[in-house]
């Protein structure tokens, strides 16, 4: 459909990794394994936080939310990536592109806020253990989780709605998904309003939550160093270390994508970072938490034991 000096595209072509046809099969296998592992790992974490009564605490409520976000985030883009890696026609319709863009932004933005909330939860648990159950009661935790979701979903809606109104002078997206920065590179003219919205949202969801995380961990570290019991110190380091590892991986990748000078030569690097950010990080989250957390490992063993026992009874 023709407009004034621009076209409203009904279909987009995703360039993806078509410049490297020899790597597409390798990337397909890599992405498929990562995606299936993400689904299995995060679904297991959600399941054990629901079924195990010992995990009915704020930390595991937030961890369950994080796992659900990771499933939604990867499911928004990876299935399309897998199909396109094996297809000669790497296309996506406008509505599919819009949904993909929104879900990726919404889940990513929500996770940025939730990681800061989880840092505050660890701060209260370690620095104010006697008042923890009062400060982090069910109502407060539910509100914190809700604020994370609402903030992420509303900022994503704002960015997506404005991005989709910008006239585009092409329909070849130099990416494997409808990533907002890649789509905006097709804009016929630079939009000051869109650039301002992107900058404000990026600052709101990246440096500010990171600052809150850093402040929380400064207090946490000072408290841990004053713990005289070696067992208590190791337990505190274990739970905080898992969260801090996830924070560094997630915010590091996000900052390298959204708060750096734009460059036409950096698109190849952006695609690699985006692949790691969108596929590898969600897969690693449950592994990091389960490997470094005795309660999670015990709950997983208990769940596997029940499944094994059930299968044994069925065979008898």
UniProtKB/Swiss-Prot annotation:
This chain's protein is named Olfactory receptor 2K2
The record's function comment reads:
Odorant receptor.
GO cellular component term, pick one: plasma membrane
Give an example GO molecular function.
Answer: olfactory receptor activity
Q: Which residues are glycosylated?
A: 5
Keywords of this protein's UniProt record, alphabetized? Cell membrane, Disulfide bond, G-protein coupled receptor, Glycoprotein, Membrane, Olfaction, Receptor, Sensory transduction, Transducer, Transmembrane, Transmembrane helix
Acyltransferase found in the keyword field: no
Report the main location listed first in the record: membrane
The compartments listed are: Cell membrane
Detail the disulphide connectivity of this chain as listed in its UniProt entry. 97-188
Offer one example of a GO biological process linked to this entry.
Answer: detection of chemical stimulus involved in sensory perception of smell
Q: Which SUPFAM superfamilies match?
A: Family A G protein-coupled receptor-like (SSF81321)
Q: Which Gene3D superfamilies match?
A: Rhodopsin 7-helix transmembrane proteins
CDD domains (alphabetical): 7tmA_OR13-like (cd15430)
Q: How does it sit in the membrane?
A: Multi-pass membrane protein
Q: Which residues lie on this side of the membrane: Extracellular?
A: 1-20, 87-97, 165-199, 260-270
**Which PANTHER family would you find in this protein's record?**
OLFACTORY RECEPTOR
Can you name the source organism? Homo sapiens
Q: Which InterPro entries match?
A: GPCR_Rhodpsn, GPCR_Rhodpsn_7TM, Olfact_rcpt
- Which sequence ranges are listed under topological domain Cytoplasmic? 42-65, 119-143, 221-238, 292-316
Mark the transmembrane ranges: 21-41, 66-86, 98-118, 144-164, 200-220, 239-259, 271-291
């Amino acid at each position: 459909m023709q407009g004034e000096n621009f076209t409203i595209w009904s279909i987009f072509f995703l360039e993806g990794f078509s410049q490297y046809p020899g790597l597409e099969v390798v990337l397909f296998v890599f992405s498929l394994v990562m995606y299936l592992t993400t689904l299995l790992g995060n679904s297991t974490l959600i399941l054990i936080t629901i079924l195990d009564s010992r995990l009915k605490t704020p930390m595991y409520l937030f961890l369950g939310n994080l796992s659900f976000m990771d499933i939604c985030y990867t499911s928004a883009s990876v299935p399309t990536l897998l199909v396109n890696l094996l297809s000669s026609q790497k296309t996506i319709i406008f509505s599919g592109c819009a949904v993909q863009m929104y879900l990726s932004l919404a889940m990513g933005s929500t996770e940025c806020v939730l990681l800061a909330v989880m840092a505050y939860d660890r701060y209260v648990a370690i620095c104010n253990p006697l008042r923890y159950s009062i400060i982090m009661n069910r109502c407060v935790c539910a509100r914190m989780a809700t604020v994370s979701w609402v903030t992420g979903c509303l900022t994503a809606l704002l960015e997506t709605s404005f991005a989709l109104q910008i006239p585009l002078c092409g329909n070849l997206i130099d990416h494997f998904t409808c990533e907002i920065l890649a789509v905006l590179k097709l804009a016929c003219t630079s939009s000051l309003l869109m650039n301002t919205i992107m900058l404000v949202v990026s600052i709101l969801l990246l440096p500010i939550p990171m600052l809150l995380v850093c402040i929380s961990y400064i207090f946490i570290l000072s408290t841990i160093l004053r713990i005289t019991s070696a067992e208590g110190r190791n337990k505190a380091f274990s739970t905080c270390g898992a969260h801090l590892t996830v924070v560094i991986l997630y915010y590091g990748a996000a900052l390298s994508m959204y708060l750096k000078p734009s460059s036409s030569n950096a698109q190849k690097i952006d695609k690699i970072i985006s692949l790691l950010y969108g596929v590898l990080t969600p897969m690693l989250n449950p592994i990091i938490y389960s490997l470094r957390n005795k309660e999670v490992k015990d709950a997983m063993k208990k769940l596997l034991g029940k499944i094994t026992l059930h299968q044994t009874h069925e065979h008898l």
